[in-house]
């Protein structure tokens, strides 16, 4: 299986979740073995910021990267879509400190990638194959990666709320690009009205609205159109996890499972994997393998 980039650049304008301002985002093809990199176009001589778990400095509400004091935030939804398509090399130019929130899912990014087209490159794609179980725990929350022939995610959340029935709080996802687009990529982020009001009083989540999130009050869902999936809440957590795990810098061959995990714990898990070289190996695979077929467009 070969490395992938885009066939052509593509640009979109969207709202920054926290700033509430318009953000211009350009996805630009990049050479083999350059990886996923971000560039702030609003700052002169800004450094390139790699999509790297070890550059994550802040995980409050999103995954945020920083180099030399220059920050790029809310990267997980875009990275999730890139992981879904197996994009290895891309230069992401952004006109502000955060990636636009779009509709709160990765669906708009899926559309952008399909419009730009996927280019196979003249170098083998590399995967991180998990060799041993690795688990991180914080209180009652945990996240784990273990050996698995493919890529799967099993996630459980725990909310005591009438709008999030208990029988919709766990979801198991067997990765393929088609499965991603149909079942996870369009699951929106969610939040509680009381929290959003508090954040906006502190000049955060200024771009948050019913257009880019599922919002719950004390009684239920405020969005008139309802949910896209019965388990949209936990499916979005899987979307987030796929993006957070892509900060490992490789597509994964392994099984991910989690209970009440979030950006901080997902990041801690990747760092823990790297902590012992015996936890993983970097491999290439044949186009005919089941892992490669999962990325067929």
UniProtKB/Swiss-Prot annotation:
List of residues binding Zn(2+): 77, 236, 240
One BP annotation, GO: lipid A biosynthetic process
Enzyme class per UniProt: hydrolase
Reactions it catalyzes: a UDP-3-O-[(3R)-3-hydroxyacyl]-N-acetyl-alpha-D-glucosamine + H2O = a UDP-3-O-[(3R)-3-hydroxyacyl]-alpha-D-glucosamine + acetate
Domain of life from the UniProt record: Bacteria
EC number: 3.5.1.108
Active-site residues, record numbering mapped to chain: 263 (proton donor)
Matching InterPro entries: Ribosomal_Su5_D2-typ_SF, UDP-acyl_GlcNac_deAcase, UDP-acyl_GlcNac_deAcase_C, UDP-acyl_N-AcGlcN_deAcase_N
GO cellular component: membrane
One Pfam family hit: LpxC
Entry's Gene Ontology molecular function annotations: metal ion binding; UDP-3-O-acyl-N-acetylglucosamine deacetylase activity
Keywords, alphabetical: Hydrolase, Lipid A biosynthesis, Lipid biosynthesis, Lipid metabolism, Metal-binding, Zinc
Biological pathway: Glycolipid biosynthesis; lipid IV(A) biosynthesis; lipid IV(A) from (3R)-3-hydroxytetradecanoyl-[acyl-carrier-protein] and UDP-N-acetyl-alpha-D-glucosamine: step 2/6
Cofactor(s) listed: Zn(2+)
Disulfide bonds: none
PANTHER family in the record: UDP-3-O-ACYL-N-ACETYLGLUCOSAMINE DEACETYLASE 1, MITOCHONDRIAL-RELATED (PTHR33694:SF1)
Database matches in NCBIfam families: lpxC
Annotated function: Catalyzes the hydrolysis of UDP-3-O-myristoyl-N-acetylglucosamine to form UDP-3-O-myristoylglucosamine and acetate, the committed step in lipid A biosynthesis.
Family per record: Belongs to the LpxC family.
Full protein name: UDP-3-O-acyl-N-acetylglucosamine deacetylase
Species assigned in the record: Psychrobacter sp. (strain PRwf-1)
Gene name, Swiss-Prot/TrEMBL: lpxC
């Amino acid at each position: 299986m070969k490395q992938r980039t885009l066939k052509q650049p593509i640009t979109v304008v969207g709202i920054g979740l926290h700033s509430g301002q318009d953000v211009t985002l350009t996805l630009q093809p990049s050479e083999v073995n350059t990886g996923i990199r971000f560039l702030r176009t609003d700052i002169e001589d800004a450094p390139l910021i790699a999509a790297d778990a070890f550059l994550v400095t802040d995980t409050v509400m999103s995954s945020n990267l920083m180099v030399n004091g220059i920050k790029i935030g809310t990267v997980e939804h875009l990275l999730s879509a890139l992981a879904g398509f197996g994009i290895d090399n891309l230069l992401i130019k952004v006109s502000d400190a955060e990636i636009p929130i779009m509709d709160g899912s990765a669906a708009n990014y899926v559309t952008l990638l399909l419009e730009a087209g996927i280019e196979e490159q003249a170098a083998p794609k590399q995967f991180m194959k998990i060799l041993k179980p690795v688990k991180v725990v914080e209180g009652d929350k945990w996240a784990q990666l273990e050996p698995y022939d493919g890529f799967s995610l099993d996630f459980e959340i725990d909310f005591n709320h009438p709008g999030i029935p208990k029988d919709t709080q766990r979801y198991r996802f067997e990765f393929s690009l088609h499965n991603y687009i149909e079942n996870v990529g369009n699951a929106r982020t969610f939040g509680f009205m009381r929290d959003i009001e508090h954040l906006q009083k502190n000049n955060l989540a200024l771009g948050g609205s019913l257009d880019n999130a599922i919002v719950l009050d004390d009684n239920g869902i405020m969005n008139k159109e309802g949910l896209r999936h019965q388990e949209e809440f936990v499916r979005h957590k899987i979307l987030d996890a796929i993006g957070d795990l892509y900060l490992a810098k490789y597509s994964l061959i392994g099984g991910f499972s989690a209970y009440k995990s979030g950006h901080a714990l997902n990041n801690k898990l990747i760092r823990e994997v790297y902590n012992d070289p015996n936890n993983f190996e970097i491999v290439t695979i044949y186009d005919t393998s089941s892992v490669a077929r999962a990325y067929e467009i």
